[in-house]
From Swiss-Prot:
Positions annotated to bind beta-L-fucose 1: 126, 185
Disruption outcome: Delays trap formation and weakens nematocidal activity. Does not affect mycelial growth, conidia production, conidial germination rates and adaption to environmental stresses.
UniProt name for this protein: Fucose-specific lectin g276
Function: Lectin that specifically binds to L-fucose. Is associated with the morphogenesis of the fungus, and plays a role in the formation of the constricting rings involved in nematode-trapping.
Positions with a binding annotation for beta-L-fucose 3: 282
One Pfam family from the record: Fungal_lectin
UniProt similarity note: Belongs to the fungal fucose-specific lectin family.
Keyword flag Zinc: no
Binding site for alpha-L-fucose 2: 222, 234, 289
Keywords from the named record: Virulence
The UniProt record lists the keyword Metal-binding: no
Residues bound to alpha-L-fucose 1: 126, 185
InterPro entries linked to this entry: Fungal_lectin
């Protein structure tokens, strides 16, 4: 029987300078995507997370050279841009500890980034960045308050297809579909039965979800979830119907985070989860599932979420993994194909919540710094 990950007596209210009203939300969810801007020959990565009062943040990191072909050293990443969205007290406000899922499409010639999150009314919202503009719309899909979110895609020519996954109020794993040219979301498949105390293979309420596609131009979909018994299982779809199978992880801490990705030209699938000792584990598929192994000896924060994104070049593969460190900072781990291993230690991604100054004319702004309130105002 799985059990909850131990917390090592960590008190989030005593974390230190990294835990404060303007800082990163303790146990925030993450989403990460790689973005290739071919018209401008630039390459960057976006990380999405949530801060203390519930605002969502978009952090953009870019290679110094801005090359789409030449990788730099790992610490050559530098903060390029940061913005806040889904502010508290607005119609776009996100629920606290909202799950996050993101995807990028290229069928318009320029990269278009889509971010999905859950509102305070437990409905899925979608933020789209396209050609320098941003929209935020409610999809009208009501989810379980503890639902996770996952998204994947495939495309051929000028048409891209999205598949969005979530958990319903009954606990079933549901799918919504978008053919991007059509522009309208439609209901897709129901992948599982409801949560059941009598079925060990039914989804755990609040299970993490992660989906990938093993093909670029057609659906060869795989999705991962945790069962009521605590095992991690796999959904598989190859264009006809969904099936469910085991991957060899029979017990993991309840609600362990799941993050999956493909490497080696989609020949290998990698799934990551956190064990009971707050270490990240990896399970690889290359025609068959291999045993679970820890990727390093470094602990993550209890209750952390995971996000992974890949940067792929000719002859190069990199996986960037993001999680929360023990002092409530964003940490990054990097795997490279050249080394065939993860780096020695995770590095810290700088997160500084924006400070706004609102003062009357003639007053010194240095002594009138403002801070956000729970309803989104600044006082």
């Amino acid at each position: 029987m799985p059990f909850e990950a131990r917390d090592d007596n960590v008190d989030p209210d005593a974390i230190g300078n990294h835990y404060h009203d303007d800082g990163l939300l303790w146990q925030t969810h993450y989403a990460a995507v790689e973005v290739f801007d071919y018209p401008h020959a630039t390459m960057h990565m976006k990380i999405f997370c949530q801060s203390y009062w519930g605002e969502l943040h978009d952090l953009t990191f870019s290679y110094k050279r801005g090359s789409t072909k030449e990788p730099e050293e790992e610490n050559a990443w530098e903060t390029k841009f940061r913005q806040s969205l889904a502010r508290p007290g607005t119609d776009e406000a996100a629920m606290m500890h909202t799950p996050l899922a993101a995807v990028v499409r290229y069928d318009t010639g320029n990269p278009t980034t889509h971010l999905f999150y859950i509102s305070t009314g437990f409905k899925i919202r979608e933020v789209i960045w396209k050609n320098g503009s941003q929209t935020n719309d409610c999809l009208g899909i009501t989810v379980c308050p503890t639902s996770s979110l996952a998204v994947t895609k495939w495309g051929a020519g000028s048409q891209t297809h999205f598949r969005l996954y979530y958990q319903s109020k009954a606990g079933t794993i549901e799918e919504h579909c978008l053919d991007c040219n059509a522009g309208t979301w439609t209901k897709g498949a129901t992948l599982s039965g409801p949560v059941s105390a009598y079925d060990d293979d039914s989804p755990l309420r609040g299970t993490s979800l992660s989906f990938i596609n093993l093909a670029q131009d057609k659906p060869e979909l795989r999705g991962y979830f945790q069962t009521a018994k605590g095992s991690i299982q796999e959904f598989t779809y190859k264009g006809t119907k969904w099936s469910t199978s085991k991957i060899g992880v029979d017990a993991a801490p309840f609600r362990t985070p799941l993050a999956a990705i493909t490497v080696e030209k989609n020949k290998i699938a990698a799934l990551y989860y956190v064990d009971a000792y707050n270490r990240i584990n990896e399970v690889l598929w290359e025609g068959d599932w291999e045993g679970s192994e820890r990727i390093d000896g470094e602990s993550v924060a209890p209750g952390t979420r995971l996000a992974v994104a890949s940067l792929k070049y000719i002859g190069h593969d990199k996986i960037h993994m993001f999680s929360s460190g023990l002092v409530n900072v964003i940490t990054q781990r990097v795997w490279t194909r050249e080394n065939g291993a993860w780096g020695d230690r995770p590095t810290i991604v700088d997160f500084e919540a924006p400070v706004q100054v609102e003062v009357e004319p003639g007053l010194d702004p240095a002594i009138h710094l403002t801070k956000p309130t729970r309803d989104g105002r600044r006082v």
